[in-house]
């Protein structure tokens, strides 16, 4: 399966909100919640690869030095064509993950929108490529 980097597709990826490209590692980061990356896809199979980092939430009063913490990983919504509701939502729960966005037996063309749902103060999320 062929892999395409963010640089390979820069002319085809439309961003909304505060996204930024980190050129050294060629990652397109979502900087805020509701940031969006949109593109047209034609084919039978599409994966997206993410780089993610977790934040930490306190599970009790912040004044308690022994309060337990839990990891918070970024959540993504996938919108297909003009559907007002996402076709799926998922948590990117490790530093490097690849997710299936589309699979069909025959080639199809769709407009795909990826939306970061979580606050940036709690997590970070970037796209490293497509395959």
Give the residues covered by each predicted segment.
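N-terminal secretory targeting modules
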Residues: 1-131
